């Protein structure tokens, strides 16, 4: 197939790309953060009302008072989004609820509106602002409520079955077989009972009733033999003893216990999704498919025969009788006696012959279409689920795969919030009931009954500390977008890392088009945290749906009609791939088409195809769809590529890739990092911080101008990860803009496209071994021209509190600090904006009162004369930590007097923002988009870099050995196509699974006038001689990752010590030392390096006296004294003594060595000598 030259596609206002796509897309990508916004909107519109409806009315124990929830409304938020961030507040709106209190004795009605706390609002970008920080609520993947059947082998290898009825909340019902072919039931994880006990308790007391109901079979006979009860009352008592062991059982108690466990909507909730799944599973049609009828089916109304005995129900026959099934064929009304429920039970029952035995009849029982709004389980559900279990034992029916996405659903923001709110409301309900019984009924008002504390607390707890409420990843727009589309199987009610096996983590065929098979973290969470595929949507039940183009069964044409299918609906259809060839009419050109049916990939006759994929990229997530030539990369490397793009640091001068995939525009627009137009209009005014757009609308075919929309751009703000969040205008005055168009680029954006890195000239070659093990050699040009320079903003804060000895004070007047150190502080002791600061410089001068000592008479006299301060103060100023130098960007001051909300005990809070400009540096980590990552090992002068025949030096040298074994060939194709694109002055788009193939790349290379093999001769920059072989040189898109050497570099001279062991702390955060561990000690022992070893184990570590003396000796230039006894040895002896052993330390001549107990004085002296801080909390003691 020869390469086609591609066609031009416009992405936004400023960018045209040559696209190599062959498949025309029928469906636009949906709004990528819809999963967040739609779910929260549902919560505001429906979810809240649903909850108030569930809990209303609240009645007191006597039934005299009743409190009803009438209506609710959300007010205006107290602060805007920006202001909430600045003030460390929540972006929230007051929730007011209208209540009605009815006094049933007097008939008096009181209405009142009650404030129920501030409710956090979602911003337009799909995030929440909690305490000034942007957070995202991640959607959770959980097992859907419903009834599940699974096959299992016992220890003898005999096949048995298990089944579970899982509610949304409430008691579980589990059925299982044992080695003796007895069917047992467990109620709510208690000891097992024969299943017939449960049936008797439902009111089918005698053996004969049970046999008539379920149908005669060996399993049932075995179970009845094992069953000790013989009527409903005994069965009820038996169940009560299991559920409430040790309590005296009575029949009435047992009845009410079972009713409250299963049939009370407040205690047992299937949710609408559970009801839907149970009705679907227990429907007769799946069990009747391809079975032989053992009775004649007659329409109950007309009396006509629908199907006769001995008919085989294939797909066609079954489709014909399904409407009759729904009209009541086979309905039986059961009249239970003495059971839990008095009412009759309606089931649907049909007899068939056993699949492996034509003589044997089997009863199939369904639950006869229970209404959607019945959210608790019913007796007919229990009977039909038991019937299904017996059917399974005879080979009728299917077991379920719990990893199938038809059985796993998403709990998104709205539902998670609703569950949390429900917990708060039910706690409140208890309080209301208590208050109703205590207070005077005549004067009481709704306001006095309600206590909003539990509701507010449960919402606060959810946003503040739930596993699913996460600090937003704001490194770059792609990280932000991916975080909002993340699906986690962890969290409350989900799995735990330790318990999750391989099956749950694995890719499943039902993930196709719903969850990305590639993007997931490496490490312990692999497969438990996933990403939503690009076209996927979530339906009202929380199942993920993916779009398919419908194939018209009459004409076999692929239509543009789109159906969204869930995973279990898709199981019934044959689906063709998106790249199947079609002619102009939309029919398949080939007789046999590659298609999927469930887990199979088959070649199918074109007439059998029901649906076709909408797009090749519907399989993968947004981040994965940004990798060009994904189809040429190994999946493990593609995973790393997708994950590393999210860690790209926004650069000072971003540049969109020459070789893109066409996803760059959409993902940048939907991420929320760009400024987008809210209405059509004309740009009137553009400046760095503001864009004005005059609205324009069409009325009766005429243009009408409206008001002005003002968009403010955020300049140089610190993101959650300390990168620089900066927006720049993308339009000019006079431009016409349409709704949704990008007006301002966010961080890592260029001309309205995602721009995570830079296009650089790359050669695949070695150079003196400096790129061994994936290391990267770089030209100094990239440093000089600020190609990979990024801006980082760090925030430091200092608060003045009230202490027991008096308030702390922010001041310039600091003890023992020279004027030189204070030169950049203003009169309040706060650093000025624009000052350049280095390690250990003062940012905020602050003093804390020390304890006042008794003064001598002379001192008192002096103080009286000179008015000296008698109080002693200690310097507790905020200083720049190691490696934190830079330029002061901004200072924010919050005080009580100015009316700022501060935590209790804090009088003043100062925040200082320091900005750093970081150029690329040896030790920084870089990567391409194909999982090809490496650390910069050497930055060479431009003149030493290899250069091309026209004299251009290359920018980066990568090791060619990094390609073959990693199998990410995509980077080589990108290299050549990028070179051609640069030569032609174009940008190209090569969408995943439908992009440029090898021929396209070669034809573009030829068009650009490059050599046929796309390689070139390179000359050594040092000697000017040509290298032996031709070398692949091209343009690759490389990104700088957030793992920067400046954040990791760390050195300690002396510093804090752990309190008990007196050993140095570890880690950069604690200013710790390097651990010299067990194995390192062995290495020194092997060389017999006794003195080195001794000083490492004593004076460099925990010989308290020795290290102080050593420090003094070094300062004075004397020789280092003999080491003493390490503190850890003393700790060991103290531990032995505390166990009651008499252990003494003896010297060489058997003299006892006195162990000196450390006093507080020693600590202070030592601290002065070392200028160190004693860690006051045990958390700082990072012990191994």
From Swiss-Prot:
One of its GO terms (cellular component) is DNA-directed RNA polymerase complex. GO terms for biological process: DNA-templated transcription. Belongs to the RNA polymerase beta chain family. PROSITE patterns: RNA_POL_BETA. Gene3D superfamilies: 2.40.50.100, 2.40.50.150, 3.90.1100.10, DNA-directed RNA polymerase, subunit 2, domain 6, RNA polymerase alpha subunit dimerisation domain, RNA polymerase Rpb2, domain 2. Residues 1160-1184 are annotated as: Disordered. Pfam families: RNA_pol_Rpb2_1 (PF04563), RNA_pol_Rpb2_2 (PF04561), RNA_pol_Rpb2_3 (PF04565), RNA_pol_Rpb2_45 (PF10385), RNA_pol_Rpb2_6 (PF00562), RNA_pol_Rpb2_7 (PF04560). This is DNA-directed RNA polymerase subunit beta. The RNAP catalytic core consists of 2 alpha, 1 beta, 1 beta' and 1 omega subunit. When a sigma factor is associated with the core the holoenzyme is formed, which can initiate transcription. GO terms for molecular function: DNA binding; DNA-directed RNA polymerase activity; ribonucleoside binding. It comes from Listeria monocytogenes serotype 4a (strain HCC23).
